[in-house]
Amino acid sequence: MPIHVVKSGETIYSIAQLYDVSADRIVYDNELAAQQNLVPGQALLILMPSRVHIVREGQTIEQIAEEYSITVKNLYQNNPFLLNQTYLLEGQSLVISYEGEPLMQGRISGYAYPFIEPYILREVLLYIDEILIFSYGFTAEGELIPPQIDETWVIQEAWNQQVEPILVLTPFAETGTFNSGLIQILSENETVQDNLIENLLETVREKGYVGVDVDFEYIRPEDQVGYADFVNRLRETMNENGYRVSVALAPKTSSYQKGLLYEAMDYHLLGQSANTVFLMTYEWGYTYGPPLPVAPLPNVRQVLEYALAEIPKEKIVLGIPNYGYSWLLPYERGVTKARLIGNVEANVIAAERGVEIQYDERYQSPFFYYEIGRRRYEVWFEDVRSIYAKLQLAAEKDIRGVGYWNLMRPFRANWLLVNQMLH
């Protein structure tokens, strides 16, 4: 499963000849249709088929899957373009299997809002095991506030593809904005906790969720124990009724780490309280900060190693970002606001501006600079090299799996890579 880094003068066809694979498949797998040309330094996923089926007249997907003793979903995973075909074409090539063995049998998850594009959702559901639907808020009395857009259709699509939907609980008030006061009320008041837990159980049952993910941030240090107690009480009730609870953790590297984002996140307590944890190992480079990789590998490794010292490895999910940022230079603290971009979009920008993509070996992250008029920008994003490095780390530590924030933007090469490495 090579990852090819484009050199100056190379074309899709010369690369296809080099690996003896289809040029059309390289374009499709790497979502190159929007690019006028390849970019020096761009990383391309090259999947090498080990077994291919040529469609015969009248054959169906189900018949082909049965012929090779694989599932229909396996066939779609290896050939996601089938999602957009109403029938098979005689003579069409379908990949039955690819070369290479998976690194681990990890679980794959990701967050999504109910307004995700249907075509993105349908494809990503081929490759994940759990979808965390963002999000339910709550009132000071413990009443649930549902998402502004009804999420029922996402739940139904998930179950249609044997993917487990999980309700995400956030401290969002009726205004739809973050409210740290709600965390304080919940942490201090067991009556509010009881009401919220009861409402969560009812909603999980009615909607068809398999559990709850608690995603709270900026918790007061004095609410540390009360928050962990709430997660524990929620987990006990959910487990008794056949559901599970996960908790999202800010990226800490020590128990004494200062800052409102970190101090009340007691990895040991929360690891005991929840069934699983989701490490938010991203946002080192963020909207209002200086240009940096979103998830530099040394930092990610440091957080994971601290988590492993506090939490059983089978409970840990490593967070991976599915986005990048573009910063206007020079960076001015309190003034500069980075623009959020997709990883496929980053390659398109580099192609349009005719600039080379560079790769920081220490951070294991791609980046580049471009100009519009007299304005200069710096971009950090993810590509298949940086994703591969994170998946290798997850496999090395033998943890539960990986999870994405978030699933809203296309990144097909990532999902094909995940399918090869973790399934």
Residue map of PLM features:
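Substrate-binding cleft and catalytic face of glycoside hydrolase catalytic domains
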Residues: 94, 153-191, 199-207, 211, ...
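Glycan-recognition patch characteristic of GH18 chitinases/ENGases
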Residues: 99-195
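Short, acidic/polar
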Residues: 112-127, 190-205, 259-268, 382-393
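Conserved, mostly hydrophobic/aromatic
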Residues: 131, 214, 277, 318, ...
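Active-site groove signature of glycoside hydrolases
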Residues: 132, 195-226, 276-290
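Substrate-binding surface in catalytic domains of secreted glycosidases
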Residues: 140-149, 225-229, 233-350
